[in-house]
Amino acid sequence: MLLMENKAVENINIELPEILVTPSELKKEIPLSNTARSTLADGRKAIENILERKDHRIFVVVGPCSIHDLKAAHEYAAKLKELAEKVSDTILIVMRVYFEKPRTTTGWKGLINDPFMNDSFKITDGLRIGR
């Protein structure tokens, strides 16, 4: 009988384990403001009303697909809000931002995975920034 050498087969590409912040910890650390909570609730209700044909408007979901520059994302959101107010009688504009790039196999993986775009993979920082 051949004896197997004790060779590592699990976690061989792990440099350093890092415990991630949990969703409940993150919610406690960075709670939603009353304004954000109201915006979310009102937006969800408006979409529900459109889907149930209680509201005649259409809704349009727009990007950006992913963000890396928070200042630019805030500027984009402000411009989009102006447009949304102008067309609000007929269209509900919903801004959707994704914090990861799930179909990307090479290069930057997104704000959560690599928030500083330097391959440091500070995921907990990315989660906080995304929140």
Q: What kind of region is each of these model predictions?
A:
Residues G63:
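Conserved, mostly hydrophobic/aromatic
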Residues A78-R131:
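A generic, well-ordered mixed alpha/beta core segment in the N-terminal half of proteins
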Residues M1-I12:
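N-terminal catalytic cores of peptidoglycan-degrading enzymes
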Residues E10-K54:
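N- or domain-start disorder-to-order transition segments that initiate the globular core
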Residues E18, L32-T39, H68, A72, ...:
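Catalytic cores of large soluble enzymes that bind and process phosphate-bearing ligands
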Residues T39-R57, H68, A72-K86:
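Generic N-terminal targeting/processing segments that precede catalytic cores or assembly contacts
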